[in-house]
Amino acid sequence: MRVKGGSVTRQRRKRWLEKAEGSWGTRNTSYRIARQTVIRAAEYAYRDRRNKKRDFRKLWISRINAAVRELGYTYSQFMNALVKANVVTKDGQGLNRKMLSELAINNPEAFNQLVDKVMK
């Protein structure tokens, strides 16, 4: 005798359709397309959680570079001086790029003092 699945199949499909809520067009009504949409969204989310770390690091470096160039130095010269002065260490102790970027934006006077101190 054939078993069609009935309520189990309906529940499973309903779960996929609920995850696709907010999608446009048939992406939230058609089971097959909704399932593909949800799977692809999960792949993008997984990938971009990793890319976000790269993007923010690039942003912080750009901001630090811009702030340091106003004072006549390059980013690489500044970071080298920070490492030699033990302000930034390889094991993550001390100031990191995020902190330096925030300091350059929100408190330029303190950032300028830091640059003057380590570049001597």
Swiss-Prot record:
Report keywords, A-Z. Answer: Ribonucleoprotein, Ribosomal protein, RNA-binding, rRNA-binding
Which superkingdom heads the taxonomic lineage of this protein's source? Bacteria
Q: Does the keyword Ribonucleoprotein apply?
A: yes
GO MF term (any one): structural constituent of ribosome
Q: Name one GO cellular component term.
A: ribosome
PROSITE patterns, alphabetized: RIBOSOMAL_L20
One of its GO biological process terms is: ribosomal large subunit assembly
Q: Which residues form the signal peptide?
A: none
In terms of Gene3D superfamilies, this protein maps to: 6.10.160.10, Ribosomal protein L20 (1.10.1900.20)
Please give the function described in this protein's UniProt entry.
Binds directly to 23S ribosomal RNA and is necessary for the in vitro assembly process of the 50S ribosomal subunit. It is not involved in the protein synthesizing functions of that subunit.
What PANTHER family does UniProt report for this protein, alphabetically?
Answer: 39S RIBOSOMAL PROTEIN L20
Query: According to its UniProt record, which protein family does this protein belong to?
Result: Belongs to the bacterial ribosomal protein bL20 family.
Indicate what this protein is called per its UniProt record.
Answer: Large ribosomal subunit protein bL20
Q: Which gene encodes it?
A: rplT
